[in-house]
Regions:
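Phosphate- and other anionic-substrate recognition elements at nucleic-acid/protein interfaces
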Residues: 1-130
Length: 130
């Protein structure tokens, strides 16, 4: 079971891969939203043993290219409301926010809600179903 937390921003993302009990599969690393780097990320995610789910927050439109790319590559992607992730895990007195910590928090959120994660469906796909 691999939870991939992706903290998305404009043109780049911070990635963290976690397993249950706080096991770090991959220390947080950054990728650009280029074809080459998304292809490398896809190859890496497919090489992981066990089931893998990618979790990211709705971030305006910035999440869409990476979510679509990974979904089209056959990887499970779940896009969640940022407020749910923000409220997850209690509050910290320090309130330190970094992309690395956010990616880890998103991955841990995914682990705790593994069974309930809804798979991402692009808007066009939803329109075709109507």
């Amino acid at each position: 079971m691999n939870a991939v937390g992706i903290d998305v921003s404009k043109g780049k993302s911070m990635i963290a891969v976690m397993r249950p009990f706080g096991e770090v599969v991959a220390s947080p690393f950054e990728i650009s939203h280029t074809e080459r780097e998304l292809k490398e990320l896809t190859r890496f995610l497919k090489s992981l043993s066990g089931e893998t789910k990618v979790i990211m927050e709705y971030t305006g439109k910035y999440y869409q290219p990476i979510a679509r790319y990974l979904r089209e590559a056959g990887i499970f992607v779940s896009v969640v409301n940022a407020i749910l992730v923000h409220d997850y895990g209690g509050t910290s007195l320090r309130r330190v926010k970094t992309d690395k910590k956010d990616a880890i928090k998103i991955a841990n959120y995914g682990l705790d809600r593994w069974i309930d994660l809804a798979e991402y469906t692009p808007e066009e796909d939803i329109r075709h179903l109507l």
